Amino acid sequence: MDLVYGLVWLLTVLLEGISGQGVYAPPTVRIVHSGLACNIEEERYSERVYTIREGETLELTCLVTGHPRPQIRWTKTAGSASDRFQDSSVFNETLRITNIQRHQGGRYYCKAENGLGSPAIKSIRVDVYYLDDPVVTVHQSIGEAKEQFYYERTVFLRCVANSNPPVRYSWRRGQEVLLQGSDKGVEIYEPFFTQGETKILKLKNLRPQDYANYSCIASVRNVCNIPDKMVSFRLSNKTASPSIKLLVDDPIVVNPGEAITLVCVTTGGEPTPSLTWVRSFGTLPEKIVLNGGTLTIPAITSDDAGTYSCIANNNVGNPAKKSTNIIVRALKKGRFWITPDPYHKDDNIQIGREVKISCQVEAVPSEELTFSWFKNGRPLRSSERMVITQTDPDVSPGTTNLDIIDLKFTDFGTYTCVASLKGGGISDISIDVNISSSTVPPNLTVPQEKSPLVTREGDTIELQCQVTGKPKPIILWSRADKEVAMPDGTMQMESYDGTLRIVNVSREMSGMYRCQTSQYNGFNVKPREALVQLIVQYPPAVEPAFLEIRQGQDRSVTMSCRVLRAYPIRVLTYEWRLGNKLLRTGQFDSQEYTEYPLKSLSNENYGVYNCSIINEAGAGRCSFLVTGKAYAPEFYYDTYNPVWQNRHRVYSYSLQWTQMNPDAVDRIVAYRLGIRQAGQQRWWEQEIKINGNIQKGELITYNLTELIKPEAYEVRLTPLTKFGEGDSTIRVIKYTGEFHCGFEDGNICLFTQDDTDNFDWTKQSTATRNTKYTPNTGPSADRSGSKEGFYMYIETSRPRLEGEKARLLSPVFSIAPKNPYGPTNSAYCFSFFYHMYGQHIGVLNVYLRLKGQTTIENPLWSSSGNKGQRWNEAHVNIYPITSFQLIFEGIRGPGIEGDIAIDDVSIAEGECAKQDLPTKNSVDGAVGILVHIWLFPVIILISILSPRR
C-alpha cells in the first residue's frame, strides 16, 4: 500500500510545473511591525493599534501575495486630512520612520495592486506616546471685590501636561501627598470642560501652612517606559502676578537705517517673570539682538515696521503685555495726472477753461506729509486763480491738487510738486508737469502689420501699441478675449513705451490683447484702447508618441498615427520611415490619421518606425518599435518554503515563474539563467531548455542548488526565441532557515482546519474575545503578554462533548531530496508555546505527517491535564526524509473549563539546544527518529529529474 501512495506522489511531482495553471491571483496584504508594541494594560482596543514612544523608530512591513507581484504604496490619514509623506508616497514594502513625532501618529494604509481584481488595502493605527514637562499656573482671588464669585482668599494651582495616553496628576505639599478629603482646606478637582487635561488644586481661605513648596507629578503609568515628570512651585505671601513697563514712546517714528532699542522692565511679580518679545504680524526680524527685556533692531527698514509687544509671565495670574508701534518713514510711488475742465465735454486743454493738476505719493506716516508747488522753479502760493488743495485722505490719501482757473497763455510752463516729510531724513519726491499748447490727451493706434501677429510656439514676440500725446501715459496690457492672467501672473502688465514683450510663447497665449492708457502720468480722461491679435502656430500634436508592438514572425501588424491638434490645420503632410529609409509620403485630406500595414513580419521588418506629420510650424512624430522580443518573465514570490535545507553549508532554492503574454511572440525555446552572489560582479549563466508551448499562467519551476548558506543571490532570467533575447527580470533570493508563526496575520500562516475532526480551532485575542467567555480557563494574553496579540485555541464550552477532537494542520514544509544511503537526515528543531489551564483540561497531541503518507501520522508530542495559568514551551527534534506536515490535535476534557491554546510555532534548522529538550521520553516527550525506507527509490528518482519545469 505504501508503494501505491509513493507512486501517486511521484506522479504528482512530475506533473508539477508542466501543467501548473491558475497561478495568476489578485493581491492580498497584511501588515506586520518590528518590535513589541508598548500596550496599555486595558482592554480598550477592538482594532489593530500599534503603540510606540515618541523619538523611536517605526517600521511597518506590508506582506503581500498575488501574481504578478503586486505594486505597494503606503499612505497615511489623520482625521479628515491626508498626509502622503511630504507629498510623496512610499512605494516599497517597508515603511520606516526614524525619530517618530506625535503628529506622525494616525492610520497607515498599505495598498497592493497587480491589475487583477480590486486592490488589496489593509491599515493599522499607530499611536505615538509622549509626555511633556508639566506646567503649573497660579490664579488667586485675594482682595477681590465681593461681587466676584469667590469671597474668601483663595488660590488655585493648575497643572497641565501634554501627553498621550491621558496623564494622571498627583499633588504634593513638601513631602506630603495631597488627596481629596485629606485636608479640609484643600480641594482637588478636574473642571468639566477640560476632559481630564488638567487637575486643579484649590487652597481655600489661605492658612499659614498653605505657604509651602507644591509639586505636581504627571504620569502615564510608565507606558512605553515613559518616566513620570514633576514640576514644583513655591507659594508664599509674596506670590504675585507680573507687571511691566515699556521705557519707550508709542508710537516710535524713525528713519530707515537707524538703530532702535526697545526696553521692557518688570515692575512686579513673584516669582520673577520671564520677558519675551513678539510681533503682531509675522516673526521677529532675524537681525534683532535680544538681551533680557531689551530688543535692538540695527539698521531698521520698512519691512521691520509693526507692533512689538513685551510679554511677562511667571505662571501666576495672566501674563502682562505692553505694546508699541514702530513706524518707519517712507516716500514712494510718485505720480501725476491732468484733468481738463469737467464742465465741458472736451478732453483738450483750452485757454479760458479750467485745468487741474494732481500729484500723489505714498507716505508713512501720512500725517507728516507736506506738499510744495513751484512754477518754473519759483514757489507757488494758493490764490484766486491758482487754488492749491489736498484731497480728503479717506478718498484719495497722499494727494494734492493745483486748480488753474481761467487758463491764460501766461499760465503755460512747468509745474513742480514736491512731497516731503516733516521729520526729515527721507529724500523728497519731485514731480514735473508741463502745461503748454502742445499738452494734448493721448491717442492709441496699432502700427500696420502689427496685428494680427503670427509667431511660432517657443519664440519671443513683441506686441506694440503706438501712443501719441503729451505727456505719454503708462500703457496697461491685458487679455481681451478671456479672463486669464498675463505672462507675469498678473491680470494687467504696465508698459512705459507701449511694447509688450513675451518670451517663450505658448499656444495658450493665442488670442486678443488689449492695450489701454492709464490715468497716471497722463490725462485723467476716458481710457484709449486698441486691440492686437496674436496667432501662435505650433506643430501637430499626435498620438501615440511611442508604442511598442511585439509580434512573432509571419504575423501582420498595422501602425496608425493620429493628429490630435495642430495650427495651421491645413495643409498637413506625412512621412513613414524605417530608420533612415523612406517608406511612404502623402497628404491629409479629410482623415485625421495615417496607417502603415505590415502583412507578414520578417527579420528585416523589425525596427523603429517613425511617422512624421508636418505643417508650417514643424512636425509631430509617432514612433513604433516593432520587435519580436519576448516579454519579461514574472517571478512567483508566493512559493511556500522555497528554501531546501539539505546540507550543512549549502541550500537549494525552488525558483518559480510564469511568462508574461507568451503568445505575443514566437515560441520561447529556452531561458538564460544568470546567478551571482549578492555584492559580486560576475554572473554565472546556463540555459534552461523549454519543450512545447508555454501557456498563459503556467507555473515553471527550476531548482537552484549548491547555494552557500546564508548568502543571498541575484537571479536574472531572460527568455529566448528565434528572434533572440527577450526582456530580463532580476530578483533577489535569500536564505531563510526558520519558520515562525504567531497567528497574527489573517491567513494564520496557511494553517488549515482538518475536515475530519469534530470542531475547529479558533483564532483569538484577549481584546477581541467574547465577553461571555468561560472564566478560570484559557489565557489572559498571548505568549508575549499582549492583550491585542493572537493565538489559536479550542473552545470547550457547550455543545462540545468529552473526547471530541479539533485538528489544525500546518502548511507542507519542503526539504531537499538527498541520497538516503548517505549521512543522517537533516535535523530540525520544532518548538511552540502551549497554554493548558482549567480543571477540565483534556489532551494536546502533536503528530508528524510525511508527504505521501496521507493516513499514517506519527505521534510526536503529547501533554494532558492542568498546567497552570501560564504559557509553557515545548521543543522537539524531528528528522524528516521528505516534505512534512505538523498536526495539532486538541481533545476536549470532561467539562467546560478545558480551553487549550497554542502560540509562536517555530521550525528552525538544526537540533534543539540540549537544555531545551525534555529530560525523559515520557508522555510529554518527543518521538524518536522517523525513517521510511520505501521512499528511497522515489527520492533518488526526484534527484535525477531535478531541475525540472
Swiss-Prot record:
One of its GO terms (cellular component) is plasma membrane. Residues 739-914 form the MAM domain. Residues 1-25 form the signal peptide. Residues 638-738 form the Fibronectin type-III domain. A lipid is attached at D924 (GPI-anchor amidated aspartate). Residues 925-949 form a propeptide. CDD domains: Ig, MAM. The keyword Metal-binding does not apply. Interacts (through the Ig-like domains) with NLGN2. This is MAM domain-containing glycosylphosphatidylinositol anchor protein 2.
